[in-house]
Swiss-Prot record:
Recorded superkingdom: Eukaryota
Protein source organism: Oryctolagus cuniculus
Alphabetical keyword list: Disulfide bond, Extracellular matrix, Metalloenzyme inhibitor, Metalloprotease inhibitor, Protease inhibitor, Secreted
Keyword Transferase: no
Positions of the UniProt region annotated as Involved in metalloproteinase-binding: 53-54
SMART domains, per database record: NTR
Protein's name in the database: Metalloproteinase inhibitor 3
Pfam families in UniProt: TIMP
Length: 151
């Protein structure tokens, strides 16, 4: 819900571009499917990220995997980084894959309430309690792999 673009894509090339003080890695992608962003950019060909992982830049494998990529659009370019949800497609659970097609868009009005210690509870109808923090110190816990907040 917070991303401008959500796509399934295979990285087919990469190039280091000298934009900004540290450089930008530009990945060429073959878009397999778009889940979000039809109006902002109906077809994504390039994904931009910081060249350095220390600046939240992503390192993606070329011609090896398909990825679920999320990001923002600025000045007609798609940007992503370590703070965005990026995962190899084959590492997603069946629930996550189904969520992309059928469920996640129904939860954009939900508020996730993180539970760090017990007891914890929701305080309004549009809240979903996220308890992954109790056992797995956050992502990726069972809830993040198998649940969706829908209101």
């Amino acid at each position: 819900c917070n991303s401008d673009i959500v796509i399934r894509a295979k990285v087919v090339g990469k190039k280091l571009v000298k934009e900004g003080p540290f450089g930008t890695m530009v990945y060429t992608v073959k878009q397999m499917k778009m889940y979000r962003g039809f109006t902002k950019m109906p077809h994504v060909q390039y994904i931009h990220t910081e060249a350095s992982e220390s600046l939240c830049g992503l390192k993606l494998e070329v011609n090896k995997y398909q990825y679920l990529l999320t990001g923002r659009v600025y000045d007609g370019k798609v940007y992503t980084g370590l703070c965005n949800f990026v995962e190899r497609w084959d590492q997603l659970t069946l629930s996550q894959r189904k969520g992309l097609n059928y469920r996640y868009h129904l939860g954009c009005n939900c508020k996730i309430k993180s539970c760090y210690y017990l007891p914890c509870f929701v305080t309004s109808k549009n809240e979903c309690l996220w308890t992954d923090m109790l056992s797995n110190f956050g992502y990726p816990g069972y809830q993040s792999k198998h649940y969706a907040c829908i209101r």
